[in-house]
Amino acid sequence: MKNVLALSLLLFSLSAAAQCDSVSEINVQIVELAKKKLGKKVDRGECWDLAKYVLDETGANWDGFLKFGMALKKGECVMPGDIIQFDKLKTVMVVNGLKTSESFPQHTAIVYEVKNADELVLIHQNTGYTGKKVGTSTFKFSTITTGKYTIYRPIAH
């Protein structure tokens, strides 16, 4: 039991990110563009399509593939408009006594809101919640059991 608790605390400390004191202009624009698409399908409805749309519309500097800007280091502050790329990530949580799990084999999402160091609200599409349409969902770093993620800070041209 002590080992499980120690591992959980280690995962949380490596995963949690601080909230930034301010939000960059390009990130504000990204959130506003994504918000206007709530309930709508962007392009093919793939998760990546929403990120591509907001980055292209803002004229952001990115590689057109999976490098959505500058990769943040663990522990750096996260702001709305940052883009998170999940890779083979799994989460497990207990809600009202029920154990639920979620898998993100390869998924792209935009940070919509930073609740605290552990909890984000994501805006994304191609999910189990909203299908191919843009919607929001909560993500907690403390629920990660396996896999990895990278958070990118969009860069203005």
Feature locations, PLM:
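Aromatic- and glycine-rich peptidoglycan recognition patches
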Residues: D21, E25, E102-H157
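N-terminal capping segments
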Residues: Q19-M70, L89, K99-F104
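Hydrophobic alpha-helical elements and their junctions with loops/disorder across both membrane
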Residues: S13-S15, K41, N116
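...with weaker cross-activation on analogous glycine-rich loops/strands in unrelated enzymes
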Residues: A60-G128
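Compositionally biased, intrinsically disordered low-complexity regions
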Residues: S8, N61, L66, A71, ...
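Bacterial Sec-dependent N-terminal signal peptides
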Residues: M1-D21
